[in-house]
Design a protein with these regions (language model features):
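Substrate-binding pocket helix/loop in short-chain dehydrogenase/reductase
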Residues: 98-99, 103-108
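The beta1-alpha1 cofactor-binding region of Rossmann-like NAD(H)/NADP(H)-dependent oxidoreductases
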Residues: 61-72, 104
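Active-site helix of classical SDR
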Residues: 122, 157
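Conserved glycine-rich cofactor-binding loop
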Residues: 15-16
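Conserved glycine-rich Rossmann-like NAD(P)H-binding loop of the short-chain dehydrogenase/reductase
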Residues: 29-46
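Residue(s) in the substrate-gating loop at a strand-loop-helix junction
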Residues: 141
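SDR active-site lid
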Residues: 174-238
Length: 266
């Protein structure tokens, strides 16, 4: 790639959590950062912090549930900065509830956001990434590999992300573009505090073991490193790697462990 100061990275879901921390990490490395999510006021705060530190940031609000918004975002990036070197499809959310409770509306919303939105983000970025031998980062989850009681729709969506990543790794052979699928374990996020209608509930407790949850800045560093190294598939957090290993070799034990673990509320 060229000098990092000439390179442009576009991050969806950049207003909070992992996306926000990745924005700071790419900016620290000298990349121009394009920030997208639905929450413009939070994006402006992230952009302001990046600029205050001497970096370059561009805010382009975008709802990944709308294809035209994604297409327009890419057009704005090229109009403003003339190129695109990295796209990180990070935007997403969780829909909670057991299989008996989830409605068609719940399933459609989950898959449209975490699967279709991600795929369409890549679709419109690809023509420009091919011009720069660029990089794609898809944010999945260790849930792609595991049973997911009360999170079946979410787990299915992340399994689809894993499949999309594998497909892209074949389709992009010879193009110079790499695709890294990132599967984090527990990382600090708002996901358990947002209900199935997208309403935030700050009072909701996080059922995940607090001693296993990584801070977002730690996660961002290893994710950016994996993308830069053009890794194909990257599972991280120590417990995440252990869970995936157990599921592969001792699935009965993993089912038992998960059955005894706290479940998120719907």
């Amino acid at each position: 790639m060229t000098n990092p100061q000439e390179n442009v990275v576009w991050i969806t879901g950049a207003s909070s959590g992992i996306g926000k921390s990745m924005a700071f990490e790419w900016a620290r490395l000298g990349y121009k950062v394009v920030l997208s999510s639905r929450r413009k006021e939070l994006l402006e705060k992230v952009a302001g912090d990046i600029r205050h530190s001497g970096g370059a940031a561009l805010v382009i609000p975008c709802d990944i549930l709308e294809e035209t918004a994604i297409e327009n975002a890419v057009q704005q990036i090229i109009l403003a900065w003339g190129r695109l070197d990295v796209v990180i499809a990070n935007a997403g959310f969780g829909v909670f509830g057991n299989m008996e409770k989830l409605t068609a509306k719940d399933w459609n919303r989950q898959l449209q956001g975490n699967v279709t939105g991600l795929a369409i983000t890549v679709k419109y970025a690809l023509p420009h990434l091919k011009k720069t031998n660029g990089r794609i980062g898809l944010v999945g989850s260790v849930g792609a590999y595991l049973p997911n009681p009360n999170l079946g729709a979410y787990g299915a969506s992340k399994a689809a992300v894993h499949s999309i990543g594998q497909t892209l790794q074949v389709e992009l052979l010879g193009t110079g573009v790499s695709c890294t699928t990132l599967h984090p374990g527990f990382v600090v996020s708002e996901i358990t505090r947002i209900d199935n209608n997208g309403v935030w509930h700050p009072e909701r407790p996080d059922p995940r073991p607090s001693n296993l949850i990584w801070p977002t800045d730690k996660a961002a560093k290893v994710m950016v490193k994996a993308i830069l190294k053009r890794r194909r598939n990257y599972v991280f957090t120590t417990h995440g790697k252990i869970f995936v290993w157990l599921q592969r070799w001792f699935p009965g034990l993993m089912r038992f462990i998960i059955s005894k673990s706290p479940k998120p509320d719907s």
